C-alpha cells in the first residue's frame, strides 16, 4: 500500500473536499472517477474525504465514498480520530450505522484514549452511543449459517440471518416491539424457525461469557431476546391466532392503574434465568429490581434498557406506550395522556386503554386547571412586584427632590449652620459640667 502524506493534495482532490461540503453527489462521483483523485487522500490535518463527509452529516456522500473503496478505519488523523468518531460526533444515526456496517472498529481510541462511543457520550449524542454499543457484525451471525465441524447442516438457516440480525441490533428492547418484529416477518413467525433462532442466541450468549474479553452486556441482551423467542414459541404452540394473543397479554393492564403486570413479570423472569450467576451485570440488575414492588419505579424494563443500551433515563423524550419506540409524538385525542408512534400502535393498545381513558382525561383536565391557576397567580405576583417597585421608585424620587430643594435655599443652610454651632457649644458646656473641678498641678 502506497503511503499517503498529509496535505499533499492534487487540485482535483481539493475540489473533492469542497464538493463534499457544498456540492452534490453527482459532482463528487465525477471527481472520484478521475485518475488524479485518491479516495483516501489526506488533508493537512490527516482527514480523509470520508471523515469530512461523516462529520458534515452527508449520508449519500459517505455511501458513495465507501463504494469507491474508502478506508473506514483510516487512523491518520492528527488526533487519532476515525470516520466512526466523526459520524458519532455529528449525531447522525444513519451515518453511524453505515460506518459500522462497513466494518468500522468500535474499540479504536483517539489521542486522549477515547473510543467513538465515549466521544459521542461526551457531546451528548446518546442515540449514536446506543447504536455503537448495540451493534453486532453480520459476519459473526453468518458463521452459524454454515455447517461447523461434524455438523451436516448449519445451526441457522441462511434465510433467517437477515431478520434475526435486525432484531439483534435493535436498540428498542421492549418485549412488544420484539414480538412485533417477529410477527411482521413470516419467516420468523414459525415455531421451527424460532427454535433455531433462540438456540443460536444461547450459543452467542455463551461465547460472550467464555471469551477472553468477556462481554456481559451483549450476553445479557442475547439471553433476553432468547427468552422472548421462547415465550413466542409457547404461544405459537398453544394458540391458533399466533402472536396477537401474546401482544395483548403483554399490554393488558391491571384494573387499578393499568400497569402491565405480565410484561413486568416476563422481563424479571428473563433476568432471573440468566445462567451466569457470577456476572457483575446480573448482580447489579438484581439489586436494582428486587426491592421494587411490581408497579413502582423503576420498572424492570427501564433498568434493563439502561444497562444494555446505555440510554439515559433523564433525557426529555417521549416513548410509545405500546412498543416503547423512542420519539413517539401522537397522543390519544380524548385523554391527551397516552402517546403512540402511529395509528397501528394505538389500535393495538385500545383494548387496554379504553378502560382507563376517561379517568386519564379527568386527570389531564385537573392538571390543566391547576397549571392555569398557577400561571395566573404567578402573573398576579409579578404585577404586584412591578407595582411595589414603582411605588418605591416614586418615594425615592420625592426624597431626592426634597434634599435638592434644601440645598438650593441658602437661608435655610445658614440657619442650619447656626443651629449646628449652637448645639456644638451646648455640647461643650455639658462636657465641662460633667467633668467638674480639676485638681491643679500646683
From Swiss-Prot:
One MF term in the entry's GO annotations: zinc ion binding
Isomerase keyword on record: no
The terms describing its cellular component in GO are: cilium
| Disordered: region residues | 401-442
Q: Which UniProt keywords apply?
A: ANK repeat, Cell projection, Cilium, Metal-binding, Repeat, Zinc, Zinc-finger
Q: Does the keyword Zinc-finger apply?
A: yes
The positions annotated for binding Zn(2+) 1 are 320, 323, 341, 345
Residues in ANK repeats: 45-74, 79-108, 159-188
Where is Zn(2+) 2 annotated to bind? 332, 335, 353, 357
* Residue spans of biased composition, Basic and acidic residues class: 401-421
Q: Where in the cell is it found?
A: Cell projection, Cilium
Q: Gene3D superfamilies attached here?
A: 6.10.140.2220, Ankyrin repeat-containing domain
* Zn finger region (MYND-type): 320-357
Extract the PANTHER family matched here: ANKYRIN REPEAT AND MYND DOMAIN-CONTAINING PROTEIN 2
**Reported function:** May be involved in the trafficking of signaling proteins to the cilia.
Q: How does it assemble?
A: Interacts with the retinal-specific guanylyl cyclase GC1.
Output this protein's name: Ankyrin repeat and MYND domain-containing protein 2
List the source organism: Bos taurus
What would be the name of the gene that encodes this protein?
A: ANKMY2
Amino acid at each position: 500500500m502506497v503511503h499517503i502524506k498529509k496535505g499533499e493534495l492534487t487540485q482535483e482532490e481539493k475540489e473533492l473536499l469542497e464538493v463534499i461540503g457544498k456540492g452534490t453527489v453527482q459532482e463528487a462521483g465525477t471527481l472520484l472517477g478521475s485518475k488524479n483523485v485518491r479516495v483516501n487522500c489526506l488533508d493537512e490535518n490527516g482527514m480523509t474525504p470520508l471523515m469530512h463527509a461523516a462529520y458534515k452529516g452527508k449520508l449519500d456522500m459517505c455511501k458513495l465514498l465507501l463504494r469507491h473503496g474508502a478506508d473506514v478505519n483510516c487512523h491518520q488523523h492528527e488526533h487519532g480520530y476515525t470516520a466512526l468518531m466523526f459520524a458519532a460526533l455529528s449525531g447522525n444515526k444513519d451515518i453511524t450505522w453505515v460506518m459500522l456496517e462497513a466494518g468500522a472498529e468500535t474499540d479504536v481510541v483517539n489521542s486522549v484514549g477515547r473510543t467513538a462511543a465515549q466521544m459521542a457520550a461526551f457531546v451528548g449524542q446518546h442515540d449514536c452511543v446506543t447504536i455503537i454499543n448495540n451493534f453486532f457484525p453480520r459476519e459473526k451471525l453468518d458463521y452459524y449459517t454454515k455447517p461447523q465441524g461434524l455438523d451436516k447442516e448449519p445451526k441457522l438457516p441462511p434465510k433467517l440471518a437477515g431478520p434475526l440480525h435486525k432484531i439483534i441490533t435493535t436498540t428498542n428492547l421492549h418485549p412488544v416491539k420484539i414480538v412485533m418484529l417477529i410477527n411482521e416477518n413470516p419467516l420468523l413467525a414459525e415455531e421451527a424457525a424460532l427454535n433455531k433462532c433462540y438456540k443460536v442466541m444461547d450459543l452467542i450468549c455463551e461465547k460472550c461469557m467464555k471469551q477472553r474479553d468477556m462481554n456481559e452486556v451483549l450476553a445479557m441482551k442475547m439471553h433476553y431476546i432468547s427468552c422472548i423467542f421462547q415465550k413466542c414459541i409457547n404461544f405459537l404452540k398453544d394458540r391458533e391466532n399466533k402472536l396477537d394473543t401474546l401482544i395483548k397479554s403483554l399490554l393488558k393492564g391491571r384494573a387499578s392503574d393499568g400497569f402491565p403486570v405480565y410484561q413486568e413479570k416476563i422481563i424479571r423472569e428473563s433476568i432471573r434465568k440468566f445462567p451466569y450467576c457470577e456476572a457483575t451485570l446480573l448482580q447489579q440488575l438484581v439489586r436494582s429490581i428486587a426491592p421494587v414492588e411490581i408497579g413502582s419505579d423503576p420498572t424492570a424494563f427501564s433498568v434493563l434498557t439502561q444497562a444494555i443500551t446505555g440510554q439515559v433515563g433523564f433525557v426529555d423524550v417521549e416513548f410509545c406506550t405500546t412498543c416503547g419506540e423512542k420519539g413517539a409524538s401522537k397522543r390519544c385525542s380524548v385523554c391527551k395522556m397516552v402517546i403512540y408512534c402511529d395509528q397501528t400502535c394505538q389500535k393495538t393498545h385500545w383494548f387496554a386503554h379504553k378502560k382507563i381513558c376517561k379517568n386519564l382525561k379527568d386527570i389531564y383536565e385537573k392538571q390543566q386547571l391547576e397549571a392555569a391557576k398557577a400561571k395566573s397567580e404567578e402573573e398576579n405576583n409579578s404585577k404586584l412586584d412591578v407595582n411595589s417597585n414603582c411605588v418605591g421608585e416614586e418615594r425615592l424620587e420625592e426624597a431626592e427632590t426634597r434634599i435638592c430643594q434644601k440645598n438650593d435655599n441658602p437661608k435655610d443652610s445658614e440657619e442650619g449652620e447656626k443651629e449646628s454651632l449652637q448645639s456644638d457649644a451646648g455640647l461643650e458646656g455639658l462636657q465641662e459640667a460633667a467633668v467638674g473641678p480639676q485638681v491643679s498641678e500646683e
